[in-house]
Amino acid sequence: MPDKPTKEKLMEQLKGGIIVSCQALPGEPLYSETGGIMPLMAKAAQEAGAVGIRANSVRDIKEIQAITDLPIIGIIKKDYPPQEPFITATMTEVDQLAALNIAVIAMDCTKRDRHDGLDIASFIRQVKEKYPNQLLMADISTFDEGLVAHQAGIDFVGTTLSGYTPYSRQEAGPDVALIEALCKAGIAVIAEGKIHSPEEAKKINDLGVAGIVVGGAITRPKEIAERFIEALKS
């Protein structure tokens, strides 16, 4: 297992490359109770030249770590109804991810009500205090959320949740305007969400982002097939 990179070192590794998100949740075609599928996705991504992996769950991350030294952005998806945030939503999930010695922990940093009752700035500060050497990524949906996370000391701001909160911009493709605004504000941006084509990735890379995550367009064959099938119907 490689040593954790510094922010500067990681930014060098990620610059101009693609981080591939390798995830499958229960009920999805590639989900397996016994595991073993996501590390194959990660292996394919590595062979293609990916610069990093985004993965969900302790099990999947451990399996991926066994086959690649690529930096991992780790999350744990767990529902806490009635609250909506479910991506690394409490310190419990942070603790589990921190024990894995991964490069980055990503967490929901939207303004929505949280299970722990904290505002997002307080949560970020608590995590930073507990794990001062752990790089953190804020999954946000609006510019203001990104700014709050940045000012609270987050290392990277990801546009992951744009279009997935009721108050954020609803678009079929990536939220380029949000990515551009965050970059112009001097924030280290990891662009993520609805990036469906190499052309979109190239356009986003030219904005000066710190990294780009692509998931569904690479690792969700059902979603990829649906896009082709829908195109023939139109």
From Swiss-Prot:
CDD domains: NanE. Pathway: Amino-sugar metabolism; N-acetylneuraminate degradation; D-fructose 6-phosphate from N-acetylneuraminate: step 3/5. One of its GO terms (molecular function) is N-acylglucosamine-6-phosphate 2-epimerase activity. GO terms for biological process: carbohydrate metabolic process; N-acetylmannosamine catabolic process; N-acetylneuraminate catabolic process. Keywords: Carbohydrate metabolism, Isomerase. It catalyses: an N-acyl-D-glucosamine 6-phosphate = an N-acyl-D-mannosamine 6-phosphate. Pfam families: NanE (PF04131). Belongs to the NanE family. Converts N-acetylmannosamine-6-phosphate (ManNAc-6-P) to N-acetylglucosamine-6-phosphate (GlcNAc-6-P). NCBIfam families: PRK01130.1 (NF002231). This is Putative N-acetylmannosamine-6-phosphate 2-epimerase. It comes from Streptococcus pyogenes serotype M1.
